[in-house]
Amino acid sequence: MFTRRIINPLDLPGWVPKTDISDPKFSGGLKKGAQTWSEDGSAQDCQIQSLTEEEILKGHVYASSWPSMFIGGYSDHIRIVRVIPSGSEKVTILAEWLFEKKTLENKKYNKDNVINFAKRVMEQDAHACELNQKGIHSHPYKNGFLMPEEYVIKRFHDWLRKQL
């Protein structure tokens, strides 16, 4: 795709929007009936009190803080993930879950429902990253050129080199 200067499926010839399909893989958001990012999709009757109904229905909000932090806001919790370099090709992933005090005091609330789901997703993401890293070291791999759209990555790489 990159050799044809396509960085988004929308750029593909013949691409058709699927705006009339509510499946989250096309529209984003949570699966039908889900309230949060958890094993069973349930917020277990514990939602962050300051959220509006619209924010709760949206399901999640994401933010990134360069160079290495990701924040996910959900109806019942917030998850902060930090990627910390621990070597030239190794990182440590730190994940923190923030819950309202009232949620943690609720004896019926099972935070493992949230944590186990996110841990599984992070393990799957880590596996995909490891496969990509292996590919970089394979013999057929040849460095390419960055496209203009990728210069934010180049700026990050330049910043990282200065820090080392």
Protein language model features and the residues they cover:
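C-terminal catalytic domain of Rieske-type non-heme iron oxygenases
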Residues: 1-164
